[in-house]
């Protein structure tokens, strides 16, 4: 079950098509993996482009989290928490993630 959950969650980790994509935004330190399991702007105020990217990615993540929770008989919160754990493990050096206290940390 853990492998299935991990595969489902990571399938949407890097999906979207904007003028700036998620990889570029992470490379530039504009966005990172929030403790909630969703993408968030690291720098405030965020540009309209970054806000749009975050909203699009998070809408897809939420939909996937809901499907995964239903398939695995878990809660949305459990799925989001597990996604965050996996995302932090896979965060590239130089990219940001929130630590358990919510502080932005550069890996």
Where are these predicted regions, by residue range?
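Positively charged n-region of N-terminal signal peptides that target proteins for export
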Residues: 1-4
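Bacterial N-terminal signal peptides
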Residues: 7-15
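Generic anion/oxyanion-binding catalytic loop in active/binding sites
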Residues: 8, 50, 68
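Amphipathic, charged alpha-helical segments and their helix-to-coil junctions
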Residues: 20-56, 76-107
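Short, well-ordered alpha-helical segments
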Residues: 54-69
């Amino acid at each position: 079950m853990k492998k299935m959950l991990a595969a489902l969650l990571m399938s949407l980790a890097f999906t979207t098509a904007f003028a700036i994509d998620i990889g570029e935004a992470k490379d530039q330190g504009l966005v990172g993996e929030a403790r909630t399991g969703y993408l968030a702007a690291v720098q405030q105020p965020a540009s309209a482009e970054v806000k749009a990217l975050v909203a699009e990615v998070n809408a897809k993540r939420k939909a996937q989290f809901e499907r995964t929770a239903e398939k695995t008989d878990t809660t949305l919160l459990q799925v989001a928490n597990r996604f965050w754990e996996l995302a932090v493990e896979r965060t590239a050096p130089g990219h940001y993630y929130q630590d358990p206290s919510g502080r932005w940390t550069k890996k």
